[in-house]
UniProtKB/Swiss-Prot annotation:
Topology of the protein relative to the lipid bilayer: Multi-pass membrane protein
Superkingdom, taxonomy of origin: Bacteria
Family: Belongs to the SLC26A/SulP transporter (TC 2.A.53) family.
Name of the protein in its database record: Putative sulfate transporter YvdB
Signal peptide: none
GO CC terms of this entry: plasma membrane
Domain STAS: 420-530
Record bears the keyword Transmembrane: yes
């Protein structure tokens, strides 16, 4: 049994490895799929639909052989906010639009650009999402009643505090049993899917010893149907697309970033190399397909991808198997899921939040007490207090500002008044400066002030040593042109030594090279004669 193309060299032995890995990760995905759906504000079956449809598509069309896709914790606060504001139908439309965007991102080769998001921003918003997921489950863990959900963190926390008196002892016992099983199984039986084990045991305990004493999936959302929903293309109108564009863009950007991070984790574990652009296309196809069958937005799941690799996966077939396993469980066991207490789901999500919180990274970066610490803290705080969009946008803006500041400080301008060339000329109207570092909009202020000051003192000839300037933008080019004009008004001249390829190309394109004059450019200062 051999296949060509992507599965070249594939055989029965490899399929057996993929089958085992796919079954294990499929079992892991079942409780997580339901839990993430509930946390996002939709019925649990939508999470399972997503695992099946999006999970299979991501494996078949993505750029990583080991990627496992589906609903993830990172999406929870985003999807919950969209549900609160626009409703489920519009969430599905936003997910479809995000899929189209992701395909376009991949086709326009934007995969590598997504890797440029600074680490403090990633750690900050990931930790912020973890806090939101964890705190959102406090009500289910304690079995609180009549807790209304709000878009803002502080409103939700105030609501929980107000309803603390409605706690349910049976729900707390059920949640604690699930939490203990999760923690113990991770230490004692690391290869056993702890989430499924905790879900099953805590549910059985609740059904046998505390029947009808707490909220369940059935009492809250109704019975899960034993089939996929019918194919239904979303009703797209221009007004809806304009309204949902910001939400779709956030889903696309977060989904793309999360999927590439997950693929990079897989690369580190297997020594492989994923195709970022193909991964974005695969994620896009998955997010276009999932809403057609009731699925919510999906992305690469780091923990499930790692589980896939640890259990011997060798190809995308394992991801397909994982989707098929979830589908079979959905078709056979769906009615039994109505008995699962919400208190059994809460510790699963709390542990997911704890594991994704980047605690060590946060502590290490905050200890640095530098720009990265400030960016992380700002991104984290704004993600929690407002939303992911504000948090990430502010984090990126701060990172940009600090980067410009660092780069501008890296530019140095040195007066070369003792240079041998000046000593030979013995002309007091000639000055020479050596410039080091990039010349761009962030460094032009010091460039202009330094050079113009000396142009006024020695207006005849200015020699610039630029062999250590490897980048120049149009802002710096404009300053250079201004300096040249000042010198020419005094019948002087500007000479440039050691101009590198990128600045030279820029000066040619803008015409400044011709205005300065070819005869005033030198490869080495020894060539200066006039």
């Amino acid at each position: 049994m051999r296949f060509s193309g992507r599965f070249k060299g594939y055989n029965l032995q490899k399929f057996q490895k993929d089958l085992i890995a796919g079954i294990v990760v499929g079992v892991v995905a079942i409780p997580l799929g339901m839990a993430f759906a509930i946390a996002s504000g939709v019925e649990p079956e939508y999470g399972l639909y997503t695992v099946v449809i999006a999970g299979i598509c991501i494996s078949l069309f993505g750029g990583s052989k080991y990627q496992i896709g589906g609903p993830t914790g990172a999406f929870v606060p985003i999807l919950f906010g969209i549900i609160m504001q626009y409703g489920l139908e519009n969430l599905l439309i936003a997910g479809f639009m995000a899929g189209v965007m992701l395909v376009l991102f991949g086709l326009f080769k934007l995969g590598k650009i997504m890797k440029f998001v600074p680490k403090p921003v990633i750690v900050g918003f990931t930790a912020g999402i973890a806090v939101l997921i964890f705190t959102e489950q406090i009500a289910n863990f304690l079995g609180l009643r009549n807790v209304e959900k709000h878009e803002n963190f502080h409103h939700n926390m105030f609501e929980i505090v107000q309803q603390l008196g409605t706690f349910n002892v049976y729900a707390i016992l059920t949640a604690v049993i699930g939490l203990v099983i999760l923690l113990v199984s991770a230490k004692v039986m690391p290869k056993v899917p702890g989430a499924l084990l905790a879900l099953l045991i805590s549910t059985v305990v609740a059904v046998v010893f505390f029947p009808d004493r707490m909220a369940t999936i059935g009492s809250t959302y109704g019975e899960i149907p034993r089939h996929l929903p019918e194919f239904q293309f979303p009703e797209l109108t221009l007004d809806k697309m304009v309204m949902l564009f910001p939400a779709a863009l956030v889903i696309a950007l977060l989904g793309g970033l999360e999927s590439i991070l997950s693929a990079m984790v897989a690369d580190n574990m297997k020594g492989s190399k994923h195709d970022s652009n193909k991964e974005l296309v695969g994620q896009g196809i998955a997010n276009m397909a999932a809403p057609l069958f009731g699925g919510i937005p999906a992305t690469g799941a780091i923990a499930r991808t790692a589980t896939n690799i640890k259990n011997g996966a060798v190809s995308p077939v394992s991801g397909v198997v994982h989707g098929v396993v979830v589908l079979l469980v959905l078709l056979v066991f769906a009615p039994y899921a109505s008995h699962v207490p919400l208190a059994s789901m809460a510790p699963i999500l709390m542990v997911v939040a704890w594991n994704m919180s980047e605690r060590k990274e946060v502590a290490n970066m905050l200890r640095l007490k530098n720009a990265d610490s400030f960016i992380l803290a700002a991104t984290f705080a704004l993600t929690v207090l407002f939303d992911l969009i504000i948090g990430v946008a502010t984090g990126l803006l701060l990172a940009f500002v600090f980067f410009i500041r660092r780069m501008s400080e890296a530019t140095r301008i040195h007066n070369q008044e003792t240079h041998p060339v000046l000593a030979k000329r013995e002309d007091p109207s000639v000055s020479m400066y050596a410039i080091e570092g990039p010349l761009f909009f962030g460094s032009i202020d010091s460039l202009e002030s330094s050079l113009l000051e000396h142009v006024q003192k020695k207006p005849k000839t200015l020699i610039l040593l630029m062999n250590k300037v490897h980048y120049m933008d149009t802002s710096a080019e404009a300053v250079l042109g201004n300096i040249m004009n000042r010198i020419k008004r005094h019948n002087g001249k500007l000479m440039i030594v050691g101009l590198q390829s990128q600045p030279k190309e820029l000066l040619h394109k803008t015409g400044l090279f011709h205005k300065i004059g070819k005869q005033h450019f030198f490869d080495h200062h020894d060539e200066i004669t006039g």
